[in-house]
Amino acid sequence: MEAVAEHDFQAGSPDELSFKRGNTLKVLNKDEDPHWYKAELDGNEGFIPSNYIRMTECNWYLGKITRNDAEVLLKKPTVRDGHFLVRQCESSPGEFSISVRFQDSVQHFKVLRDQNGKYYLWAVKFNSLNELVAYHRTASVSRTHTILLSDMNVETKFVQALFDFNPQESGELAFKRGDVITLINKDDPNWWEGQLNNRRGIFPSNYVCPYNSNKSNSNVAPGFNFGN
């Protein structure tokens, strides 16, 4: 993902990254701590304060959602061929995968990086995930089928836990404050159904809030995750 610096920042420790207002940074990880993101600028990596930058819109990035949960979301009846999401790669932390709906199934493509930090799936390389996604809206992500990326509305598909929830009955879904839950059913206004870490169950609707992938939720604790 990309972000634009809104203020100058001078690193205060070796693991932080300095930048100037107006710089465009590659955000490598924003899921471990909502206050400090891991980013790259001019080949250098380090942590940056999230309130010094403005994220470029990317509703397609869902962070630490598992491969299985990605498939649950993308196999819903309202999802069409080409609808996709980008997530952190389970087998290689810090790297990314693209999950795409195609012909009643979901295909997964690992995003590769070369020694210069450029992103690619096949031959064409890009400076950022944003550029890679934009390119594959008109050029297939697959070499065997024509699969063009297109957006789906994910904001209503996920909720984020405001509090810990410990089940009292069988069939309820346990979660921790900050967890992001795949929303399956909310026909009952008080008890919704969701999935987290390959577990499925119901939970109280007043324990969660809508999840926005582009903003850190100030109501939740640092270290929230997508159930990876």
Swiss-Prot record:
The organism's place on the tree of life at top rank: Eukaryota
Tissue and organ expression note: Expressed in body wall muscles, pharynx, intestine and hypodermis.
Cited InterPro entries: Grb2-like, SH2, SH2_dom_sf, SH3-like_dom_sf, SH3_domain
One Pfam family from the record: SH2
UniProt cross-references to PROSITE patterns, sorted A to Z: SH2, SH3
Result when mutating residue 49 to L: In n1619; lethal at the larval stage, mild defect in vulva development and partially impaired sex myoblast migration. Rescues fluid accumulation in crl-1 e1745ts mutant
Signal peptide start and end residues: none
Record domain SH3: where: 1-58, 154-213
Phenotype on disruption: RNAi-mediated knockdown or RNAi-mediated knockdown in body wall muscles causes ectopic membrane extensions from body wall muscles.
The keyword Cytoplasm belongs to this UniProt entry's keyword annotation: no
Membrane as UniProt keyword: yes
CDD domains the UniProt entry points to: SH2_Grb2_like, SH3_GRB2_like_C, SH3_GRB2_like_N
One BP annotation, GO: regulation of cell projection organization
All residue ranges annotated as the SH2 domain in the record: 60-152
Annotated localization: Cell membrane
Result of altering residue 90 to K: In n1779; mild defect in vulva development and partially impaired sex myoblast migration. Causes ectopic muscle membrane extension. Reduced lev-1 synaptic levels. Moderate increase in resistance to nicotine-induced paralysis
Gene Ontology molecular function, alphabetical: epidermal growth factor receptor binding; phosphotyrosine residue binding
Keywords (A to Z) from UniProt: Cell membrane, Membrane, Repeat, SH2 domain, SH3 domain
Family, as annotated: Belongs to the GRB2/sem-5/DRK family.
Quaternary assembly: Interacts (probably via SH3 domain 2) with soc-1 (via C-terminus). Interacts with mig-2 (active GTP-bound form) and wsp-1. Interacts with mig-13; the interaction is direct.
Cross-referenced PANTHER family: PROTEIN ENHANCER OF SEVENLESS 2B (PTHR46037)
Function: Adapter protein which modulates signaling mediated by several receptor tyrosine kinases such as egl-15 and let-23 probably acting upstream of let-60/ras. Negatively regulates vulva induction probably downstream of let-23. Involved in sex myoblast migration. Negatively regulates fluid homeostasis probably downstream of egl-15. During the formation of neuromuscular junctions at the larval stage, negatively regulates membrane protrusion from body wall muscles probably downstream of egl-15.
UniProt protein name: Sex muscle abnormal protein 5
Originating organism: Caenorhabditis elegans
Organismal lineage: Eukaryota, Metazoa, Ecdysozoa, Nematoda, Chromadorea
